[in-house]
């Protein structure tokens, strides 16, 4: 249990029938009249739904213990991603639905943070940027500027992103895992 005065970004709360909500934003408000309160923006850990919720200041809320572990992606087994714990070398099978958009950037050997609560995997978190190889892209034509200087490219994971015209097949690039944006070339 924690007080609403102790809220901070990233804290996971157990509310409304045992659902887990992560604090995205919070603001302590002390109006001129009346009691103080805490205005929060909460994100459902499983569904990703974001809601605004207001708590009275000092009210006790139940916190959830979320165990985050660094794991290495090993291989795919049907619709499951198999991760290996970097400390114990135990393997963990995670359903594609739980992995979500992180699947677009997972290559064998990549490290990710796996969050669990009471043995259930909540989500897979990747670093903000990863380095991937361009598997296929059309050659960029010098005079072709009608598309704003970008062209589609397929990454080694099969995910498609837009890259600048000068990028060629086989090049290693840095990609933002949150937005799928091209960040730059990787110097060999």
UniProtKB/Swiss-Prot annotation:
Keyword Repeat listed? The answer is: no
Record's superkingdom?
A: Bacteria
**Member of which family?**
Belongs to the elongation factor P family.
Select a single GO molecular function from the record's annotations and give it.
translation elongation factor activity
This protein's name: Elongation factor P
- What keywords is this UniProt entry annotated with? Cytoplasm, Elongation factor, Protein biosynthesis
GO term, biological process aspect, one: peptide biosynthetic process
- SMART domains tied to this protein: EFP (SM01185), Elong-fact-P_C (SM00841)
